[in-house]
Regions:
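Substrate-binding surface in catalytic domains of secreted glycosidases
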Residues: 80-168
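Substrate-binding cleft of secreted/luminal carbohydrate-active enzymes
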Residues: 157, 161-163, 168-248
């Protein structure tokens, strides 16, 4: 059967606690007038997840996941939020997981049951000269060298997605998710960046070398129709079977 894990993305600005902002307010003028505590945010997010599960007839949810690009300056507030959310999720018989970006591996692990290691966004998307901004293990290897001693159970997520990136006079304008996201002017350049199967398998092998348990569960992001069609079934078998093949 299919298991659904609700995932909530939270922007890092929500946890910039020094300004006492309201993390979920959409009205910028209201952000300094009503401070919301990490406990209150945890309550609201869990209640919202439960409401959406019920409205969409999604039962037997065993895990919820938080995705946030937290930094050293927001760690305390973010970890406090996770602490409360983990307690509340446990009361509902659910685990709490969180995404772990490569640059976060050198920091204290978040207080969750397990982490999802995001094996992508390794390069600088804003540089036209960067040919592999999504996944290049030349950039990733320095981050994963201490995975064997990382104290949080991890699963790995590998990229299938691609980017269309708009540059103007050699300078980054933005990632084009739709044709009308940005005006395209004469002389602009649109470049497509996407990981090849050889890049993905190199990442899989690198993770195996550091800690094979991480690949006991493999996640591919994201599985829309176009991305799935990029590779054939034999390629996917290589990913999920963790096979090394010198020919790819």
């Amino acid at each position: 059967g299919m298991e659904i894990i609700p995932v909530v993305y939270i922007v890092n600005d929500c946890f910039k606690a020094k300004t006492k902002t309201n993390p979920i307010s959409s009205d910028k003028s209201d952000r300094k007038s009503s401070a919301e505590t990490p406990r209150q945010l945890a309550d609201k997010i869990l209640n919202r997840i439960l409401q959406m599960n019920e409205a969409n007839d999604i039962g037997n949810v065993k895990e919820i996941q938080i995705d946030c690009d937290w930094t050293a300056s927001t760690k305390d507030a973010y970890f406090e939020f996770l602490h409360f959310l983990k307690e509340k999720a446990k009361d509902k018989k659910m685990q709490l997981s969180a995404t772990i970006r490569l640059h976060q591996l050198s920091m204290t692990p978040p207080p969750v049951d397990r982490g999802i290691l995001m094996m992508y966004n390794t390069g600088d998307v804003k540089q036209l000269s960067c040919q592999k901004p999504i996944l290049d293990m030349k950039d990733g290897v320095p981050y994963i060298q201490h995975l064997g001693s990382y104290p949080l159970p991890l699963s790995a997520a590998y990229p299938l997605f691609s980017w269309r990136i708009l540059f103007r006079e050699g300078k980054f304008v933005g990632i084009m998710h739709a044709d009308d996201d940005f005006p395209v002017l004469p002389g602009d350049s649109i470049v497509v960046r996407k990981p090849e199967m050889s890049d993905i398998m190199e990442a899989v092998r690198s993770i195996n070398h550091q800690n094979g348990n991480i690949n006991s569960e493999v996640i591919l992001f994201d599985l829309n129709t176009d991305n799935i069609k990029r590779f054939n079934s034999e390629d996917y078998e290589k990913i999920f079977n963790h096979r090394s093949d010198s020919s790819i």
